[in-house]
Regions:
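Bacterial lipoprotein signal-peptidase II cleavage site
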Residues: 34-46
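Ligand-binding pocket segment of bilobal, Venus flytrap-like solute-binding proteins
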Residues: 143, 222-226, 230, 234, ...
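Extracytoplasmic/periplasmic substrate-recognition and gating elements
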Residues: 288, 297-350, 410-411
Length: 411
């Protein structure tokens, strides 16, 4: 986006033109589906970059805190996961706005493609009680739970986060791995389903396509390296519930995945890399995350994201401050900054994932009512009824599931 957040969101944004053509367009809002209020609440008078949009306004960092923002903030995130200038991929309006408000330069790295892979890069330092080099990271709920369980994340000073406290949607509060909501902050939620090039495959609606040895896509199919997504979708194909998966279910799912590998249907297992491959044509069908495919429609209009007939997976990615981070206070300021409804709307309008922030829908609706009805940002009851959250695994179960999955992926 190119205009300041106090102005209306840019109606010419490429992302919007494609999200409005989504195969799921026309469903009602997520906040209605969850029975939560959609009005963001400011927790203090607006500061130097106030929002004039309905639904909430940013709040000042508490004046009692005798700290100053740091000169830099080291932020690790996934690709395609923050608003990006259409003409310059190195520019991100949200980060520029944060710099303008606090004077902090955000060193932003799209370095995360897989939770386990990234965990491996920070584990040695955290295990040794050292700074892992990141002030803020975004990881999926199961990995957030693991880091919290290990004691490897900082506890938030919620006094520095009035927006987060006021504007976090109720459905995200009190999760089992952080019942006090002071170790993690949801970044975005999304769904896992089918991503495909309709110009090659035609319309696909069933997970069976991933196991179909069709010459149009055999050998050009990718499964996700995220165990919960890959096993979860496979269980849905088999008519089983991923939210109640057993070790026996894992065995059955792994055997099913192995069939697709042995048949030569599967090209490989990937993180976000599949998105670029869909554009290039190296891949024409993939287990895919909703927002990734919609973003890439700007480069290739024939790409489609589909919630399968059998259902899909629902997940949340979360902001965490690793233990020993050099700039904890500034990381808290950033978390609170993106819980301003105007900033949350700015991000959601580009990434096309489900925003956890109250009031973001009203900001979008004031500027673009059609976008505010996007089922990928605000899923309907009908959509939510078809998606599952993978069960919370014990340490023993997680080890078992991961070992079985690694055997088939080769990782």
């Amino acid at each position: 986006m190119t205009d300041h957040t106090t102005r209306s969101l840019n109606p010419e944004l490429t992302r919007r033109r494609f999200i409005q053509g989504s195969t799921l367009a026309g469903f009602s809002a997520f906040l209605v589906a969850c029975g939560t209020s959609g009005t963001g609440t400011p927790s203090a008078p607006a500061s130097s970059a106030p929002s004039t949009e309905p639904g909430g306004s940013p709040s000042e960092a508490p004046s009692a805190v005798p700290q100053s923002p740091s000169a830099e903030l080291n932020f690790a995130n996934w690709p395609l996961y923050i608003d990006t200038d259409d003409d310059d991929e190195t520019k991100h309006k949200t980060l520029e706005d944060f710099t303008a408000k606090y004077g902090t330069v955000v060193k932003y790295s799209e370095i995360i493609n897989d939770n386990e892979e990234f965990f491996g890069t920070i584990r040695p330092a955290l295990d040794a009680g050292q700074d892992a080099g990141w002030d803020l990271v975004v990881l999926t709920d199961f990995m957030a739970a693991r880091l919290i369980r290990l004691g490897w994340v900082e506890t938030f000073d919620l006094a520095n986060m009035p927006n987060k406290t006021a504007n976090l949607q109720d459905v995200y509060k009190g999760v089992d791995f952080d019942p006090t909501d002071d170790h993690h902050a949801p970044w975005q939620s999304g769904m896992t389903g089918l991503g495909y090039d309709s110009a090659v495959t035609g319309n696909l609606t069933s997970l069976d396509a991933l196991w179909t040895n069709d010459p149009k896509w055999a050998g050009k199919v990718t499964f996700l390296t995220e165990m919960r997504d890959a096993i979860g979708l496979t269980l849905l194909k088999l008519g089983k519930d991923p939210s109640a998966a057993t070790q026996a279910d894992a065995d059955e799912a792994i055997a099913e995945i192995q069939k697709a590998v042995d048949a030569g249907i599967v090209r490989g297992f990937t993180g976000n890399e599949y998105a670029e491959d869909l554009v290039s044509g190296n891949v024409v069908l993939a287990m895919a995350w909703s927002g990734d495919v919609i973003v890439k429609q700007a480069e290739k209009e024939s790409l489609v994201w589909q919630l399968p007939d059998e259902g899909g997976m629902l997940w949340t990615d979360n902001m965490l401050i690793p233990k020993g981070a050099a700039h904890k206070y500034t990381a808290e300021l950033f978390i609170d900054f993106v819980y301003d409804p105007a900033i949350a709307a700015q991000i959601a309008a580009w990434v096309n994932y489900v925003t956890p922030v109250k009031g973001a829908k009203e900001v979008l609706a004031a500027d673009d009512p059609e976008l505010a009805e996007s089922p990928l940002i605000f899923p309907s009851d009908e959509v939510l009824a078809k998606v599952k959250i993978f069960k919370s695994l014990t340490e023993e179960e997680e080890s078992y599931f991961n070992d079985k999955f690694s055997a088939v992926t080769g990782n």
